[in-house]
Amino acid sequence: MQEMLRSVYAFNADSGNRKLLKHILRAMSLIDRKLFTYFQNPYEDNAIPIGRNQTISQPSTVARMLLLLDLKEGDNVLEIGAGSGWNAAIISFLVYPGDVISLDRIRELVDSCKKNLENLKQNVEDDGLIARLEDLYFLQEDIFTERGLWEKSFDKIIFTAGIPDKKTEKKIKDIAKELLNENGILICPYVSGPLVIYRKKKKLIREETKEQYVFVPLLEGTEE
């Protein structure tokens, strides 16, 4: 695990937010990645498969996205693309006592996230860590077609799958307009390209990272 954490630090040392990076590294050390994947080498700083043609991002990329979100204690966060649940658990640790809602369109992955979270709780003796995960919720929902969450608002929104086309990017911009609180941040990658960042300050401000990434595509509809 230490080698993974050193790699995460090296990739993100120039982020300009050393305090948050320190908290992210602590969260990654406490929320054991091996409990969220069946992969043989869970501590490699690589994306790894979790089944159903899905992957979870490499830890360095996870940290970079969370740094760009500028997570703060008390933030209410929406994640689209629950994956294995590891990213959401880290977010929950960082924003406690804020709520974290993590969505996935595939029920099997949602059920797996819930099991992984319970497995983590059973394998730690730190009541403080467990308390920081109590307001984390995994739901099956397609954010584009099922608008059950559209009456809520969030301080931060993170997509963990990539924008495949302009039509989808327009929908993501609409989500930023409708669901972000003032001063909120939304981050979403392309399938291949930079990370897109929307900041809501009376109007939406769009930015892109210089770095390029590769993600599985963001899809619509639900599956079992």
Predicted regions and their residues:
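Class I SAM-dependent transferase core
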Residues: M1-L78, W86-L94, E108-L120, E211-G221
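Conserved nucleotide-cofactor-binding alpha/beta core module
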Residues: D70-I205
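Substrate-binding/catalytic lobe of Class I Rossmann-like enzymes that use SAM or dcSAM, i.e.
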Residues: S192, I197-E224
